[in-house]
Amino acid sequence: MKKILVVLIVIALFFASERSEARKGIMGWIESSHSFTMPAAGEIEVAFSPEEGAEELVVKVIDSSRSEIKMLAYSFTSAPVVEALVRAKKRGVAVSLVANYKSNVSEEGRGKSRAALSTLVNAGCDVRVISVYQIHHDKVIIADRQTVELGSFNYSAAAAHKNSENVLVNWHNSKLAEVYLSHFERNQRQANPYQLQY
């Protein structure tokens, strides 16, 4: 017990000293880890599911885009989301998607996912699948390098109508979009073009 008390006192003194070089080194590591801090900006909009506007908010983000959409997806079967992406492409928006390979292509019963991905490829969208991670669990849209949509909402019918999910949109926050764009680009580099399957 005395040894534990001594160790705790030493640790407390170590972290209490502002001038401790070791503490500065540890704090520097913590502060420079791979998290990002930025001032709040833009406007926040949220929605939920089932049937509480989550899918509609995702479609709103896509429909609001004017120049580009970068999207990361785990599950991808939502017909309204696919239709919104095709509409965006038709109005001249550059659409890029990186989707999880296993949950959309290689598992049995993935016909809806493959059809959704194929529809986007046939519309001229850049569609890639990624398999370098256990799962690619991202659910993010970066629109026009200004707006970020994220949350637990998979781009699927189940997420819209059966699951408890959330969507958060940060409108007009270019700094946040820049951080997510960097994450998107990393994953896009690791992904392979989706091959149409007939």
Give the role of each language-model region.
Residues 58-122:
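Primarily the HKD phosphodiesterase
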Residues 38-40, 63, 90, 120-122, ...:
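Extracellular/periplasmic catalytic domains that process cell-envelope and extracellular macromolecules
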Residues 3, 94, 135-137:
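Short histidine
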Residues 75-79, 101-105, 133-136, 147-148, ...:
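Solvent-exposed loop/turn segments at secondary-structure junctions
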Residues 45-47, 70-73, 96-99, 128-129, ...:
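Structural recognition of the beta-strand scaffold that forms the well-ordered cores
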Residues 2-50, 55-56, 103-111, 182-198:
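Short, small/polar-rich loop/turn modules that mediate ligand/substrate recognition or access, typified
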